[in-house]
């Protein structure tokens, strides 16, 4: 009986060492050597202090900032521990209430609602943590942000264009604008004036 369990124990120990120690250690070293920023969470710094991550959205609700997608996490917006889809169907009254609330917030901030509102400004993403909006959603907010910052709209549009990332490898995904990076660029541009 002892001879039956010995190979099982040896295989278990070897596989545990390979999959639990060796593989994670090799991947950590590889990630730190080849992709250090991504391996450390794609952190964004301002004046030497970490202000966020390029991978997780942040709440911006002041009129002088671009607003991101709604967060599906509550009670704390953009809480990664509470990530998960909102799973609200198109006929769910809660979805209608969320969209109406966001439209009211856009209207209160002085946004012109006579034009169609990009869907990513009034709905949450699948994870509820999306840090990016579409160029159309950014363009929709240009007038409000420019007015609140007393900046020419052309300057704000240029910053949006400068912070628009294209499709990955030219074919994957859609063009997108990272809201945190754009808002930091706005702050920097206004400070430079």
UniProtKB/Swiss-Prot annotation:
InterPro entries: KdpC. Its main location: membrane. It is found in: Cell inner membrane. The keyword Transport applies. It is a single-pass membrane protein. Keywords: ATP-binding, Cell inner membrane, Cell membrane, Ion transport, Membrane, Nucleotide-binding, Potassium, Potassium transport, Transmembrane, Transmembrane helix, Transport. GO terms for cellular component: plasma membrane. The chain crosses the membrane at residues 7-27. It comes from the Bacteria. Disulfide bonds: none annotated. Pfam families: KdpC. GO terms for molecular function: ATP binding; P-type potassium transmembrane transporter activity. HAMAP family: KdpC. The system is composed of three essential subunits: KdpA, KdpB and KdpC. Belongs to the KdpC family. Part of the high-affinity ATP-driven potassium transport (or Kdp) system, which catalyzes the hydrolysis of ATP coupled with the electrogenic transport of potassium into the cytoplasm. This subunit acts as a catalytic chaperone that increases the ATP-binding affinity of the ATP-hydrolyzing subunit KdpB by the formation of a transient KdpB/KdpC/ATP ternary complex. PANTHER family: POTASSIUM-TRANSPORTING ATPASE C CHAIN, POTASSIUM-TRANSPORTING ATPASE KDPC SUBUNIT. NCBIfam families: kdpC, PRK00315.1. This is Potassium-transporting ATPase KdpC subunit. The lineage of its organism: Bacteria, Pseudomonadati, Pseudomonadota, Betaproteobacteria, Burkholderiales. The gene is kdpC.
């Amino acid at each position: 009986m002892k001879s039956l369990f010995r190979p099982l124990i040896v295989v278990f120990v070897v596989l545990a060492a390979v999959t639990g120690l060796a593989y994670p250690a090799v991947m950590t070293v590889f990630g730190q050597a080849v992709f250090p920023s991504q391996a450390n969470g794609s952190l964004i710094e301002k004046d030497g202090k970490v202000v966020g991550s390029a991978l997780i959205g942040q709440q911006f609700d002041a009129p002088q900032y671009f607003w991101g997608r709604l967060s599906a996490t509550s009670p704390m917006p953009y809480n990664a521990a509470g990530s998960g889809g909102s799973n609200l169907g198109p006929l769910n009254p809660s979805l209608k209430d969320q969209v109406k609330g966001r439209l009211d917030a856009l209207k209160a901030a002085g946004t012109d609602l006579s034009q169609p509102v990009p869907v990513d400004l009034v709905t949450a993403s699948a994870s509820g943590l999306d840090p990016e909006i579409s160029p159309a959603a950014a363009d929709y907010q240009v007038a409000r942000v420019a007015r609140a910052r007393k900046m020419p709209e052309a300057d704000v549009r240029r910053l949006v264009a400068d912070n628009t990332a294209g499709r990955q490898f030219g074919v994957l995904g859609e063009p997108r604008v990272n809201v945190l990076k754009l808002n930091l660029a706005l702050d920097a541009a206004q400070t430079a004036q």
